[in-house]
Amino acid sequence: MTARILLSLITFLLAFSTMSVAQDTLQIDFNTFLNRALDNSGQMMYQQQDVEIAENQIKQAQAQRIVPNMRLDTQHGLVPGIESDRTDLQEDEYYLDPNLRNNWNDWAIYTKFQLSAVQPVFTWGAINKAVEAARLGAEAAQYSFDAKKADLELRLFDLYFSYVLALEIERLLEEAQDKVNQIERQINDMREEGDSSLDESEVFKFEIYKSEFEIQKAEVHENMNFVKETWNYVLRNEEGNVFEPQVRFLDPVGANIEPVDFYQNAAFNNRPELKALKAGEEATETYITSLKKQNLPGLYLAGYVNFANTPNRPRQSNPFIQNSTNLFTGGFGFTIRQKLNFFSIRANIERSKIKLKQASYAQDAAKDGILLEVNNHYRQASLADVKVEQTDEALVTSKRWLRQEQLDYDFGMGEVKDLIDAMRKELELKLQLKQRIFEYNSSLAKLNKSAGIPLTTLITN
């Protein structure tokens, strides 16, 4: 009875374990893989800080609009009291006693607050221009972030479909293994039957092919392990789930290659690098305008409040006599401020103008580089398309060749060498076709990226 219970328990645990493994294997599509990898990317988190810093500069510029300069100073300490020998004076008239002296036996806490503030009223639009320059700078930072993101998305595209390619190659090798086993059985049968048509030199060639085939299998196995480990890393797989691509077969993407001028025009309109340089140029130009306006006199509203209190130091009644240890005073008014560091401002303007020219030249250089990049990727994609088409035709021919050699061998008219050659060629072309499909998809993704076209359009198509 106990043995039955133990056996049932073991069976249940094994079944539960099998279910858990099945539940932990998750197949995800490219968009899910891409979004999760981007969310976990330390590189993207690092680049995002540049965007947040640029957005913080907008807040700093906007803060100059409302009371940009407010200051509070406090002073605290112990001070002695005062005493006077004149009995005809009230405490608030002690300033009239020329013989007034400190009372070192009477100590009290001294407290003083000084509050001052300045509010811009009219600055010729210098603050608004500074805010606009900061906003354009943040826009440039966002475009730079998008450019880095596009680079990472391209690498993730290759990584996702590398897994699909590895799965395809594994299946092809399994099919090839079945054919290798079939030929090996036939050779063994011929040996047992003492068939004189069996050429030992052909057997040696087959044994060599088997060894080479085992090397291929080992390479594929290690590549698969590498891809899986890389997937686990980019997806931050801390829950122990097994992630696999939802796409199980590697086929050419459905998008067609457009004329080259389509990608050139798209690149000039969509590339985030060009948008970042353009926004940076506008930001520099706006900043120069702000600097020029800062060189003009500005109208400000300023005010202050001073308060001091010391219990043993009475406040004096004469407004012209202030007791610095016991007072309450304040005021406000308009003021005109003019910066007199003209040489420094002029140097800043000249430096900004140099940066403005630099931004213009950078755009021209970037356009030249992008044009060459688009043309190069267009050439690679077009060539990859031809390779896929021709390899597919060659594979069809190799399948007919292998079928014919298999029939000849089965009827005793063929040779092992010819059958092995046909089988090797078919496997070689199958692997080559999948590799070239992967290269075609990758080259088309690079072409789209160089044109500023989102990679997700390839998957959608």
Residue positions per predicted region:
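Bacterial N-terminal signal peptides
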Residues: 8-17
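Sec/Tat signal peptide C-region and signal peptidase I cleavage site
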Residues: 18-22
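Acidic, low-complexity, intrinsically disordered peripheral segments
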Residues: 23, 78-82, 432-461
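Periplasmic alpha-helical coiled-coil/stalk elements that build and connect Gram-negative outer-membrane
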Residues: 28-32, 149-266, 425-426, 443
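A small-residue-enriched
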Residues: 35-122, 154, 237, 264-347, ...
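Amphipathic, heptad-repeat-like alpha-helical segments
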Residues: 42-49, 161-182, 210-224, 274, ...
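Sec/SRP-type N-terminal targeting helices
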Residues: 45-49, 63, 121-149, 199-201, ...
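Alpha-helical hairpins and coiled-coil heptad-repeat segments
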Residues: 184-203, 400-420
